[in-house]
Regions:
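Bacterial N-terminal signal peptides that target proteins for export
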Residues: 1-6
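C-terminal motif of bacterial Sec signal peptides marking the signal peptidase cleavage site
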Residues: 12-15
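Sequence context surrounding c-type heme c attachment/ligation sites in exported
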Residues: 17-156
């Protein structure tokens, strides 16, 4: 009986061990957020070039489903970013930015569900604004130049 209790205790404690996030913030952005946002941003476009005017929009139910799923995925990533794995040690505005991503992504999903081309286009701009505001507050680290000397700061 003691052996069973000891094994159970070890297993229970092993389950309590803190684990690192599966991805860093930069990896989550690069591997998940960026691709999902690209699907949404690219769904509706109005292009005017030397070949004429081009209205890009989802054509099939499957196209619309991809756009809807991208918005739903962005909601989930926003929720992930609010968790301790990503928010711990950051200013409280990190959670506010992440929640703004969730909120606008809900609106984006509804626009896609409704197959509302104009609303998808409009919400794309709002998503971009939310992301840009966060990136202004939390800029990506500037990698060192190839020569080994630090690269100039973005404000220089």
């Amino acid at each position: 009986m003691r052996t069973i209790a000891a094994v159970a205790a070890v297993l229970l404690l092993a389950g309590c061990k803190a684990s690192a996030p599966a991805e860093t913030t930069q990896q989550l952005m690069k591997n998940k957020v960026d691709p999902a946002s690209k699907v949404y941003f690219d769904a509706v476009q109005y292009i005017s070039d030397e070949t004429g005017e081009h209205d890009i929009k989802p054509q099939t139910d499957a196209d619309w489903e991809k756009v809807r799923k991208a918005a739903a995925d962005l909601q989930e990533y926003g929720k992930q970013l609010q968790g301790d794995d990503y928010a711990k040690g950051r200013n409280p505005d990190w959670v506010k930015f992440s929640q703004a991503m969730v909120d606008v992504s809900k609106e984006a999903e509804q626009a896609a569900k409704g197959k509302n081309v104009d609303k998808v286009f409009e919400v794309s701009g709002t998503i971009y604004s939310v992301c840009s505001a966060c990136h202004m507050a939390y800029p990506l680290p500037v990698p060192p130049a190839a020569s080994g000397t630090p690269a100039p700061s973005p404000s220089a």
